């Protein structure tokens, strides 16, 4: 199968877009975007058939490739972890630009691939970063990403939310499950454990917020990624808990995507 034919057939698959195809050609077949234009009749090896089959089965291109680029790092991904979204990268980059995490203790809760905590650890080598997830398989992926990116100031804990967390932190950052049970998702490949959180999608936030006084320092701060449209319900959860003040921030698409918590004065 030629490069040109692979591209044509891949783009005929619903949900597959040109950036996905170009990434696959580059990362798996070492074919650049220039090669696609000037050398489109070049033959690809037999993996091309297998990859088209996987795309037809709605497997995300990131899982086919096995890694993504995130905040300047290579992050390994597989079906044990969510594929980091650009909103998460936006959160990380904004935090790293506005907060000096040097010599601070940070928890990446529900860490998945580790993209959030490892990005902070990489940029602030004097920080102490703990990454936690209920899934040992996810922790294994995060540990591999620590090795790939040559990070020395990150450790890992298997924990059901905050149940096994004993330390107190200056900052807690979390992209927890927030999809209501029974919601149809774009792909069946991503782990349900990292997606779904009760009938309203907010159970994970309730569990975390109720235990924050035990793991957050007096002047500590919390940053959540949230689903647009749930901000009022989340602020109500924070208000009922009574200790913290919640502030909603919008992303670059002007959607309510982040919630920031700190103690009331």
Feature names for model-found ranges:
Residues 126-128, 134-264:
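S-adenosylmethionine
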Residues 50-124, 129-144, 254, 260:
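SAM-dependent Rossmann-like transferase core, predominantly class I methyltransferases
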Residues 15-18, 42-45, 82-86, 198-202, ...:
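Short, solvent-exposed loop/helix junctions and linker helices
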Residues 1-65:
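N-terminal auxiliary segments of SAM/dcSAM-dependent transferases
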Residues 37-41, 67-73, 190:
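Short linear capping/connector segments at secondary-structure termini
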Residues 41-46, 97-105, 126, 163-166, ...:
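Short, glycine- and charge-enriched coil/turn segments that flank and shape catalytic ligand pockets
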């Amino acid at each position: 199968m030629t490069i040109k034919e692979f591209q044509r057939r891949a783009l005929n698959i619903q949900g597959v877009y040109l950036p996905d195809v170009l990434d696959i050609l580059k990362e798996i077949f070492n074919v650049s975007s220039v090669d696609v234009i000037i050398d489109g009749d070049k033959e690809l090896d037999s993996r091309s058939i297998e990859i088209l089959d996987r795309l037809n089965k709605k497997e995300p291109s990131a899982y086919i490739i096995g890694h993504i680029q995130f905040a300047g790092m290579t992050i390994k991904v597989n079906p044990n972890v969510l594929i980091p979204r650009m909103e998460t990268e936006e959160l990380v980059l904004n935090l790293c630009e506005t907060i000096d995490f040097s010599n601070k203790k940070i928890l990446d809760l529900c860490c998945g691939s580790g993209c959030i905590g490892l990005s902070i650890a990489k940029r602030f080598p004097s920080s102490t970063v703990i990454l936690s997830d209920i899934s040992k398989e996810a922790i294994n992926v995060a540990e591999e990403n620590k090795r790939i990116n040559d990070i020395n100031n990150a450790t890992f804990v298997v924990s059901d939310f905050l149940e096994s967390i004993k330390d107190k932190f200056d900052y807690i950052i979390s992209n927890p499950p927030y999809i209501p049970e029974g919601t149809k998702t774009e792909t069946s490949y991503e782990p349900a454990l990292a997606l779904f959180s009760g009938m309203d999608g907010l159970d994970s936030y309730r569990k975390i917020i109720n235990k924050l006084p035990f793991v957050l320092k007096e002047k500590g701060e919390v940053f959540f990624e949230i689903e647009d449209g749930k901000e009022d319900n989340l602020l109500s959860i924070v208000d009922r808990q009574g200790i913290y003040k919640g502030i909603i921030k919008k992303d670059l698409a002007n959607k309510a995507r982040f919630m920031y918590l700190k103690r009331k004065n």
